[in-house]
Amino acid sequence: MPQNEYIEQHIKKHGRRLDHEERKRKREAREAHKISEKAQKLTGWKGKQFAKKRYAEKVAMRKKIKAHEQSKLKGAAKPLEDSGEALPAYLLDREQANSAKAISSSIKQKRLEKADKFSVPLPKVRGISEEEMFKVVKTGKSKTKSWKRMITKHTFVGEGFTRRPVKMERIIRPSALRQKKANVTHPELGVTVFLPILGVKKNPQSPMYTQLGVLTKGTIIEVNVSELGMVTSGGKVVWGKYAQITNEPDRDGCVNAVLLV
């Protein structure tokens, strides 16, 4: 490997930070604010150059949007039967409707139906900062090291979960804040059942919190609904189904969720 690629070498050897994706997302979100600040504060030659660059970017974006809209408006090609000219083999399918367009439209429609099917009760939730989520744990003989973190929210860990050795465990999930069951409400039947949690599907705060199994408001969890006796159209018993947490478990001490049907 060349000498100047030491950063790539370090990434391959040690990997990235645990919060790399979150930092990248925040950096990208700040870009708009930085551009706005530059547009307001830059003066003179630098201001002119910046305005020229932004103008070129906006023109390119408008052209791209216009081209995309034009491609949507174009339908099937007109048949050329009246011309009386013989067509080569590779142009014979021009008379038929554009199959690729039809397939694309059907895929989009299916996605919309799927999104409607799995629409959640809480589409937006409050963001949680890392300072609120993690508590710094001081370690070492003189308590000067602070690389350990303890999660302050309720979490879910699987059945066969075992903690890492104490000296290697970076993130601690306290036993007192672990949840195994949830109060799940069926929206159509109007009944609430105490069901075991199978796993955490998606935490809206961060992919890292999903991996750690953190249970916060708006989290999608998978619960065991075999007790409800739900069956599929084929007659098979439904084992697991998704539900969304509607309360704040760290305040209430329990997990309340609504089944996604």
From Swiss-Prot:
CDD domains: NSA2 (cd11381). One of its GO terms (cellular component) is nucleolus. The keyword Ribonucleoprotein applies. Signal peptide: none annotated. A motif (Nuclear localization signal 1) lies at residues 11-18. Residues 18-39 have a biased composition (Basic and acidic residues). Keywords: Nucleus, Ribonucleoprotein, Ribosome biogenesis, rRNA processing. InterPro entries: NSA2_fam, Ribosomal_Se8/biogenesis_NSA2. GO terms for biological process: maturation of 5.8S rRNA; maturation of 5.8S rRNA from tricistronic rRNA transcript (SSU-rRNA, 5.8S rRNA, LSU-rRNA); maturation of LSU-rRNA; maturation of LSU-rRNA from tricistronic rRNA transcript (SSU-rRNA, 5.8S rRNA, LSU-rRNA). It holds the Pfam family Ribosomal_S8e. A motif (Nuclear localization signal 2) lies at residues 51-58. Residues 1-39 are annotated as: Disordered. It is found in: Nucleus, Nucleolus. PANTHER family: RIBOSOME BIOGENESIS PROTEIN NSA2 HOMOLOG. Component of the pre-66S ribosomal particle. Interacts with NOP7 and RRP1. Interacts with RSA4 (via WD repeats). Belongs to the eukaryotic ribosomal protein eS8 family. Ribosome biogenesis protein NSA2 subfamily. Involved in the biogenesis of the 60S ribosomal subunit. May play a part in the quality control of pre-60S particles. This is Ribosome biogenesis protein NSA2. The gene is NSA2.
